[in-house]
Amino acid sequence: MRQTARFVLRKTLLISFFLLFTGFLSAQAFPDRFIGHWKGKLNIYQGPKLAQTISVALEVFPADSGRYDWVITYGDSGKDIRRYMLIPVDTAKGHWAIDEKDGIVLDIFVTGKKFTSTFAVMGSAVQVCYWIEGEELLMEIWSFNEKPDHKSGLGTEEVPEVNVYKFSGYHFARMQKAVK
């Protein structure tokens, strides 16, 4: 019985160490795996239908002091360019910030394999998520009304009140590394 308990304890410690170590490696892989010039297509959905597809590019390159240039280009003309800066805040906890260089700074977090920011602007709440699958960089943007569309539930301890939000849009991009 004591040997079984020791075995279980060792196995638990080994699994815990493995999970901690893989989390550490995942944190170390970011943003290094994102470095480069990525190009692809951004699908913009309105309701269930694909409304528009445009070109999108993301450039991520080391700048200084642990910061990175984070440059997003929308469309083929190359006129809609967003020159942002990725800034480390508390990288051990996966906390970064995107400085839009106009007074807007958005928190963004590494959670698992995804890099996610949630914010509200002009009445819309927006969630942006980046991650890498295989050799592709994927991006999702979800948007919904900032104010609840309606409420549900009873407002009791057993059945709390729940705010329900009207969904307004979804964008999805699939990008591959490219030579600029």
Where are these regions (language model features)?
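Central antiparallel beta-sheet cores of small beta-barrel/beta-sandwich binding domains
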Residues: 42-127
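A short hydrophobic beta-strand element
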Residues: 36-40, 68, 137-141
